[in-house]
Amino acid sequence: MYKRQILDWYLANTDLQIAGPEDDPGVRSVRRIYEHYKKHDYRTVVMGASFRNAGEIEALAGCDRLTISPDLMEGLAADHADLPRQLIPAQDILKAPPALSEGEFRWAVNEDQMVTEKLAEGIRRFAADQLRLEQLLAADH
């Protein structure tokens, strides 16, 4: 989950004011995803990525995986204060919600402008990256 892209979209398209990581829509998104998957016992790894500062990372302490740049990692390593876990797996596991139909899924995606735009952009970028990789591999043979 590229939380920076979520934040950037909100800053460019809304009048959202961010006082700290708890107000960051990207941090809130990773937190919601983590809590949903753990509460329903989905067997997957939730990984947050694309951080700008240590506060965003600290707000997601306890997430299954975080990709952290070397600069931010050095800053975190130099800070000897306690880092309390912020994301804690659910103790009470709930039955998974019923699966959405394709139509319900598409409607839910279309109800959120940020999701609609960023999902489409992400798919296009991954497809372009795959094509470039395939061309590189083909050129080597």
Task: Identify the meaning behind each predicted range.
Residues M1-Y2, F126:
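Short, small-residue-biased leader/transition segments that mark boundaries at the very start
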Residues K3-Q91:
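Catalytic alpha/beta core domains of metabolic enzymes, predominantly
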Residues L87-H141:
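C-terminal extensions of enzymes
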